[in-house]
């Protein structure tokens, strides 16, 4: 209401201002409503255009977008039900994004920069073994699939801040296997466009945390350069606590490794970029794990190929200037380490329980110095065991010096091994083993010396159901054990000397080494009075006297 006390000119000006204000508000409101309505009409055209843009950048994958909405006033873009599928294995989709939002990062407008802020809510990544196999067989590396370009093509403004809220990642090895599950992933990264620290190698900061395999926790803090090509570079400090190792058993079985129980904790720093790879693990601790390597007749060829491949990989990565790997300390505590041979008749199992192992200074560069290993435990549950020595992991093949002591193992626990390789067993007795194994310049030397005491091979009560030939053989072996017994120590002692050249054009040094030591151990653990066993060539070494 215009006051009547004002002069006519003033009343006119006041009335005009009110009309202009009302007109401006009406027009502005109409524009807002029109823009709001138009934005909804644009949604139908926007969705297929964005979908086509993403697919033009992706290689080997394709995107399907359920809904897209652009608010024209604030330029906020909302995407719903974005699904990414692998062309080779489209089911299940490798990624689903229920909600994605792109908006202007208003804080940066103060500095005169127009950049975007992206948020993902409840994203889910599902990967199975078939998809991983297809990726390995592809000629295009995963990092060159066009992920960065596909994401940046969606929104006209460059992304400078990125956040993930409550993400979920699963890997399924095969039908029926429990998935590997990373849950409750939260990540925030800013300065992606290198605005504030353009001269810094890794200008972007990021933080992340997640639940690992339902019980473990992983936190990440570091810096990145998301503009590096062909893939982003990062340097990350990580802390992992209590990750259950049994979760990876379905995958580890493909390499003949069975894992039961156990928890892994570790901390360190990893730098990975197109120019350099640095892995610096300060500590890794495994508690209460049961690890069994199972040798199978049907996988024998694959096992040999795997050993050769691992050996070549080690040789390739050793002393590479752009690759630096170092593990300061690995501790395995209160665990069981086992070797199962299912290729023999009967099969047998060798194990050390109550294992405590410390491995220090493991690296891939010779100038880092030798690594040290110290292991204690109970061989076959009874033999007090200590293995200690030094080795160089950065050589062209195995290079180390190791001492082994196994005291007073119950010999009856080795009956499956004796039956498999000696075709006899024992009724009682104990075994002590001393060994020294050294490898340098592709030559192996040393000895394995077992000593047996209180051995009783034939027992009329326990062996009454055996055939007459087997009974006779065990009686002869038992008599031979008495003949070859050291009368001072009342022990049967034998020795297998190790010597040889690991260089072989048909097998790797690592494969040759493993085969020599395995054969020597089997030959040594069979009592020296079993003359059917042919020892390897004599070599050097100074074993303890029997």
Which residues make up each language-model segment?
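Extended terminal
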Residues: 2-25, 229-231, 271, 277, ...
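N-terminal amphipathic/hydrophobic interface segments
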Residues: 10-87, 149, 156, 205-211, ...
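Elongated, acidic membrane-bridging lipid-handling scaffolds
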Residues: 23, 99, 140-247, 252, ...
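Flexible beta-edge/linker motif
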Residues: 67-133, 147-172, 196-198, 203, ...
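Extracellular loop and loop/strand-boundary signature of outer-membrane beta-barrel proteins
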Residues: 88-89, 252-256, 420-422
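Transmembrane beta-barrel strands of outer-membrane/channel proteins
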Residues: 120, 238-240, 284-286, 404-406, ...
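Outer-membrane beta-barrel translocator/pore domains, especially the C-terminal barrels
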Residues: 126, 246, 285-301, 305, ...
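Flexible, surface-exposed loop regions and adjacent strand-edge segments
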Residues: 132-140, 298-306, 421, 464-469, ...
